[in-house]
């Protein structure tokens, strides 16, 4: 007696017929397609065993159904793009969705390297310095009046030059007497300490920190011998070519403050009227 060889699903004999194994179980073609064949995204019918099954992201198409959703051209063996679940040939995708190069106005094709800045796009080779025309690529650049410049060209054409070192000022900087300086170049004439953000004064148009200015040029208090800066509202008394801090203008004997009072002098000393009675 001949051993039976039937379809695992419908039990029809498979002798002399085409069949397909699924998990080592034989199936007739009809049962296999009904149970296991993928459904075409386009026409909604099963993709039979005698058809090529084209897939993209777990979706399947008959070879004849795999075409552009806009123009209908076949996408078999051609590059394509997906947009909102629809497949598009590169021409249709570019016409509808690809950005245009700000410089040459041509489409920037999918997969092409591009540069983006402030909502505009360029081909990588079109994003160039306005002055030297070299591609900027990933290098730093500076925008100026709707034009882009590489840093060296911008410095040559637009940057202010520091009055001290004569080099371009690219960021920050300070202005003193209507002249531009690098922050690191604007220093005290005496000690070379940076003055940016600090209180300073000047003599003969040269800037000085307060400490150096007082040490070099300020009058000395006749009482404590420390400099009288005269800056920041500092009050002092001047008498016969001598100066005192307000706090130092006191009677030599009793230390009474003489600010706003009468006083007497005894050689280099100043005295209140009471202490000066015995003179």
UniProtKB/Swiss-Prot annotation:
It is found in: Cytoplasm; Nucleus; Cytoplasm, Myofibril, Sarcomere, Z line. There is a cross-link at residues 78, 167, 220 (Glycyl lysine isopeptide (Lys-Gly) (interchain with G-Cter in SUMO2)). InterPro entries: LIM_FHL1/2/3/5_N, Znf_LIM. The modification Phosphoserine is found at residue 238. A zinc finger (C4-type) spans 7-31. GO terms for molecular function: bHLH transcription factor binding; identical protein binding; transcription corepressor activity; transcription factor binding; zinc ion binding. May function as a molecular transmitter linking various signaling pathways to transcriptional regulation. Negatively regulates the transcriptional repressor E4F1 and may function in cell growth. Inhibits the transcriptional activity of FOXO1 and its apoptotic function by enhancing the interaction of FOXO1 with SIRT1 and FOXO1 deacetylation. Negatively regulates the calcineurin/NFAT signaling pathway in cardiomyocytes. This is Four and a half LIM domains protein 2.
């Amino acid at each position: 007696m001949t051993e039976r060889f039937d379809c695992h699903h419908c039990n029809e004999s498979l002798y002399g017929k085409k069949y397909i194994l699924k998990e080592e179980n034989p199936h007739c073609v009809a049962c296999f397609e009904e149970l296991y064949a993928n459904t075409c995204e386009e026409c909604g019918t099963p993709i039979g065993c005698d058809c090529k099954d084209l897939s993209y992201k777990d979706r399947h198409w008959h070879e004849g159904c795999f075409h552009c959703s806009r123009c209908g051209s076949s996408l078999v063996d051609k590059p394509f793009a997906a947009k909102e679940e629809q497949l598009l040939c590169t021409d249709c995708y570019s016409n509808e969705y690809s950005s245009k190069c700000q410089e040459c106005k041509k489409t920037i094709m999918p997969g092409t390297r591009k540069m983006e800045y402030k909502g505009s796009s360029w081909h990588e080779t079109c994003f160039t310095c306005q002055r030297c025309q070299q591609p900027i690529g990933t290098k730093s650049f500076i925008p100026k009046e709707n034009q882009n410049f590489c840093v060296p060209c911008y410095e040559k054409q637009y940057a202010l030059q520091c009055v001290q070192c004569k080099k371009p000022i690219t960021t920050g900087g300070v202005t003193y007497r209507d002249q531009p300086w690098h922050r690191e170049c604007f220093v005290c004439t005496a000690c070379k300490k940076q003055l940016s953000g600090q209180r300073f004064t000047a003599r003969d148009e040269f800037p000085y920190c307060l400490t150096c200015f007082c040490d070099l040029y300020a009058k000395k208090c006749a009482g404590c011998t420390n400099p009288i800066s005269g800056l920041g509202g500092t009050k002092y008394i001047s008498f016969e070519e001598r100066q005192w801090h307000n706090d130092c203008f006191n009677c030599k004997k009793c230390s009474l403050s003489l600010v706003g009072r009468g006083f007497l002098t005894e050689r280099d000393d100043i005295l209140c009227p009471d202490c000066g009675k015995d003179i």
